[in-house]
């Protein structure tokens, strides 16, 4: 056994140390030297194509198997011909991808569109470096300040949510401001309640404009700017349709013992007379030959309107035209440099009866009633002693336009009384309510008030006079209407 192992070791060659290979000699010709001999460049090596996906290593855990391979990210767009994409991979390597002609055209078109979009983009910055808030928060913050300053009840402040149907809060703010700043304010043919109501509506409109809130189906002021065209020609008036009103005869009969009858005898002794009506009762009759009505009401009797009428009627056309000229001169006194508002009238179109958000039409007129009122005891005022231009306008034209409830009900009136209210305000006081709200705003906020765009009046069929009311649904908690 030992001899066999010894013989096997002898046959195994020794691999421990091998002699180095012989050095290669370098020989030069007689005409050459080592310095003159140029090295021959080696041929370029082929670049390894890195576009091929590298073979991933075998994962060592289950988590590595489930992980998605990193995606390549477009880093640079080459300017070679043909163009190539240089893609950056997650492992730090790069790859090159050729682009087709169609892809190049798509990229050029998208780049042109992005340049055009950048030209139309408006960059909005916050110059005050203040946090941006929503319109609702902006309005709530301003109203919280006003409600606290003008002593609105705590319960109403807690329930206030800056909603369009919370107009009573604005009215209370204006009422407190009037009592503190404008005590003893004089109004002409206007009630304090209606004046405060309109101020609250204007304040609500300014607050919504300040906050940037706009209600598409609800206008808070309930007013319009009407281009009436009632002073362009002598004796010509226009109704709300924009058409010329028709002249007709109008006979008014009043009870002799009533307040209106006694006032008619005192103010119009030349026209009013006591006579017997067809039932043999003594009444005060006033016959007006200059009454004006809508052209749809030519065939209708007194206090009757057709289904297409606008509901506008003047018992004395000349008095109405004087009232329109009065408000023109009155506005020109306050705004002598105005260019667009002279022939326009700011008029409320929704009284308290119509100031509902349900959008349902009411019986009768759908707009406020417009009536010209005489200014008594103006003839004895000397114009040379008066310097106020607004007062001079009223002295020169002693009639005022008064806006009342759409369907007023008078005392001792016969028939069923429909929905009515005590809404009553004159045209100069409507402008006064707007001006006082601007003063209130200037006392509590810096800068000028926001733009309050009051809509311009345009006739629509939904404003026609309605002789029949829609059926009313009163509601019921039962599931079935009848018992079976």
Curated annotation (Swiss-Prot):
SUPFAM superfamilies: Domain of early E2A DNA-binding protein, ADDBP (SSF47724), Zn-binding domains of ADDBP (SSF57917). Residues 51-60 have a biased composition (Low complexity). Residues 252-286 are annotated as: Flexible loop. It is found in: Host nucleus. Keywords: DNA replication, DNA-binding, Early protein, Host nucleus, Host-virus interaction, Metal-binding, Phosphoprotein, Viral DNA replication, Zinc. GO terms for molecular function: DNA binding; zinc ion binding. One of its GO terms (cellular component) is viral capsid. Zn(2+) 1 binds at residues 239, 241, 294, 310. Belongs to the adenoviridae E2A DNA-binding protein family. This is DNA-binding protein.
